Amino acid sequence: MTARLVRIAGPTVVADGLAGAALNEVVWVGEERLLGEVIRLEGDRATIQVYEETAGLALGEPAEPSGEPLAVELGPGLLGSVFDGVQRPLDALAAQQGDFLGRGARLPALDRARRWELEPSVRRGDDLVPGACLGVARSGAEAQPLLAPPHVRGRIAEVRSGALAVDEPVVRLADGAEIALLQRWPVRRPRPIRRRLAPDVPFLTGQRVLDCFFPVSAGGTAMVPGGFGTGKTVLEQSLAKHAAADVVVYVGCGERGNEMAEVLDELPKLEDPRSGGPLLGRTVLVVNTSNMPVAAREASIYTGCTIAEYFRDMGRSVALMIDSTSRWAEALREISARLEEMPGEEGYPTYLASRLARFYERAGRVETLGCGEGAVTIVGAVSPPGGDLSEPVTQCSLRATGALWALSADLAHRRHYPAVDWAISFSLEAERLRGWFEREAGEGFGALRDEAMKLLQRERELVEVAELVGTESLQDAERLVLESARLLREGFLRQSAYDPVDASCPPRKALEMLRLHLELHGRAVNAIAGGVPLHSILEAGLGARLLRLGSLPAEAIARGAEALRAELEGLLARLEAE
């Protein structure tokens, strides 16, 4: 008996006669064979969310189960590709159909015509273990390890080499099983690992305010809430360019089409500081704009996460950028409403927190099955309406992530980039990572960080007083706090994304800059206590020199800092003598 549609409600349809279907199984819906996924089963009646536009579907049209869950293709050729939320290759579809895609469009995610030169690292007679590296596949300048699927083991009977397509078998086992360059994996099932490793190595972003004040571990999770115009996209582009990640997976989930078009236009022009080639060469884009079907938006973050886990299994460090989880949650809300489920706060489903937590738990630094150590670090942008951080998506994300990098509209309007609000932001991993920074960046890192945070907190208190009584009414020591905090904000916390030197800052350089800022403040405090007037110190112009430290290369920062220290000592000695 053929299953037939009995109800259609937007992206959600109901079909009778699917008694043998499984939850999360792919179903071909209607005469045009639209892609759908089973999300609820009641006897032989299945509720299906359709990943394409359902306008024009009619009751009584067929629904055909595929027997497989929603899965993605993993293999050589992923890097530099642009997919939609269910891994259809947008470049290839645009070449075939033009700018607007028709319904039922199908193309394999990986190019079957492209040939890869295989250099095997296994031989006939070897015992194959799950996740083992079988060799390297090369095509032009691109080279990628070939992994055995996680569920396959046995004795190798045959190994092929030479130019192969991704769907051709490269290894045949004694039991007849064949392994090709590509493998398929269900998007909602995490890929297996050997064991998780301690999160005691930082995910270096190159941004001083994040690395020094609110660090996140490699394999950790961070959320970036911010309203319109606060710089979420620019920050994520900077992270993609300068963070310590071998591969970047960028998921544009439900953002406006023109914003995604801008990202697609800008990324090929950005230069990768590591290789000198285009940044797109180590990036995978999963694009699902707000005018695409809402159900595919819900699947897109799982597609991106599965691709990230595949590169992690090669022993690589992967940064997974989600922009934004708010749009994903809105898709959940719409699907939940179509299912007539009981709504929670602001109409979001009651399982929003558990779904978010389950997704963020797929991050981690791990020992892979066969390729050593790898990590997936997830950075999720949140777009709270009106910048309200008390709304449900922000609050659920707070409970599931290890760091909050809150973007401030006020700082963004003052041209302060990155516009990270140090009064709201926090990191649960800062203390755990302190030991690494003390070893690798230099002793005293944690103490300097704490001292700088106290200085910024003291500034906030004094600003409130100054707004009431005026800056002139403050004592010299209090006005010095305001001036030192201003220099710290503008010279240390602010970075230019367009300065080739200051765009990324290594930890040792950041430590030297922070130490110098706080040393100058401490010496000035002592000088004022000894009777030196504040205006005499400010007129010397050392502040302007301090603001230019960020533009010094890392190897020259120590020399520049010593010269500034010597100049300060000479100035204060002369002022104290007077």
From Swiss-Prot:
Its EC number(s): 7.1.2.2
Binding site for ATP: G226, G227, F228, G229, T230, G231, K232, T233
GO cellular component, one term: proton-transporting ATP synthase complex
Catalytic activity field: ATP + H2O + 4 H(+)(in) = ADP + phosphate + 5 H(+)(out)
Annotated disulfide bonds: none
UniProt cross-references to Pfam families, sorted A to Z: ATP-synt_ab, ATP-synt_ab_N, ATP-synt_ab_Xtn, ATP-synt_VA_C
Assigned keywords, A-Z: ATP synthesis, ATP-binding, Hydrogen ion transport, Ion transport, Nucleotide-binding, Translocase, Transport
Family membership: Belongs to the ATPase alpha/beta chains family.
Protein name according to UniProt: V-type ATP synthase alpha chain
Species the sequence originates in: Anaeromyxobacter sp. (strain Fw109-5)
